[in-house]
Amino acid sequence: MKNICILGATGSIGTQTLEVIREEKENLKLYAASANKSSEKIISIIEEFEPKYVSMTDKEAFLKVKEFCMKNNKNTEVLYGIEGMNTIASLDKVDIVLTSVVGMIGLEPTLKAIRNKKDIALANKETLVVAGEIIKKEAHENKVNILPVDSEHGAIFQCLLGNLKGDINKIHLTASGGPFRGKKREELENVTVEQALKHPNWNMGKKISIDSATLMNKGLEVIEAHFLFDVDYEDIEVVVHPESIIHSMVEYKDGSVIAQLASPDMKLPIQYALNYPIRKDRVIEKLNLFEIEKLTFYKPDLKTFKCLDLAYRAGKIGGMMPTILNSSNEYAVELFLNKKIGFLEIPKIIEECMKKFYTKEEQSVEKIIHMDKIIGEYIREKYN
């Protein structure tokens, strides 16, 4: 039995992780969970899964959940704030921590978990984007597995099994193209939030849905792949694959290309990461190749979807630049979701911040947190 801690248990990935745990009660146990404001959802989780600990980052939600547990004689301990997240991520009895919180808030508890020798099922790609070198170093020193919880990196991970790193020629990172695939820049001038949230293939949260529409999600995944698999940026190629059946491919020096195919369902990479290195019975719809009939591939349009190009540039510059890219994107997406800016202003704000805040300083956790803070203050003051 594996004891699971989910950071971000009420979001899209967290909810699908609970579905996997529900299917595998004999193998997986929800030991701890965190959420922000979703007190009603956490209460439902407490009633069904009976975790030993939950943590809420919102004070009002914390008090509501705590009151519920006291009134109903629940044995779940309720914690509060980032300190609560750090605590549940490093509990002795936790075997693996699934980090599915959105954004920079995942950095500190992920590091706490690694330093307490917990394997990480990583759905919070921002953590690796902003602190890739730090995370890699800490994971190596503490002999911790970083298991990717997304379809693309989970696919690459599997395509690399049994092969030598030195034999890799190229990683082909697939992208659906998002809801605006094939459109030109001028067609995106008046895109609405509602249109941008309608992803053709995947069921995701709001922030990642907007990132998928701008192709920033793929850009962040390029940086993530660089750190996860120690592959140069020149050897990571994004391939637009609208069907989302091939989740990524690895090309080897002898010309062989190994691909991982499956129905587009996040429960598969979640299940694989939680049970690694064992494969369990299928929790997703079986892939029927005869129904698919054809698979198509295109080059990404970097002029229309500038965020992908910006991500490559930030990754190659390195240092603090991926932090600047990520933070400016987070705040720009927040403005777009709140209808304060247009869709095409997202890459403009990111590029502006990459120029304004560029520094040759090396990474540290403190510098990353400070950079995120000053970028947030700058963007909110200028654009609100």
Swiss-Prot record:
UniProt enzyme class: oxidoreductase
The organism's place on the tree of life at top rank: Bacteria
Protein name: 1-deoxy-D-xylulose 5-phosphate reductoisomerase
Role summary: Catalyzes the NADPH-dependent rearrangement and reduction of 1-deoxy-D-xylulose-5-phosphate (DXP) to 2-C-methyl-D-erythritol 4-phosphate (MEP).
Signal peptide region: none
Entry binding sites for Mn(2+): 150, 152, 221
Keywords, ordered alphabetically: Isoprene biosynthesis, Manganese, Metal-binding, NADP, Oxidoreductase
Similarity comment: Belongs to the DXR family.
Reaction equation(s) it catalyzes: 2-C-methyl-D-erythritol 4-phosphate + NADP(+) = 1-deoxy-D-xylulose 5-phosphate + NADPH + H(+)
Coiled coil: none
Cofactor annotation: Mg(2+); Mn(2+)
Pathway the protein acts in: Isoprenoid biosynthesis; isopentenyl diphosphate biosynthesis via DXP pathway; isopentenyl diphosphate from 1-deoxy-D-xylulose 5-phosphate: step 1/6
A GO MF term: manganese ion binding
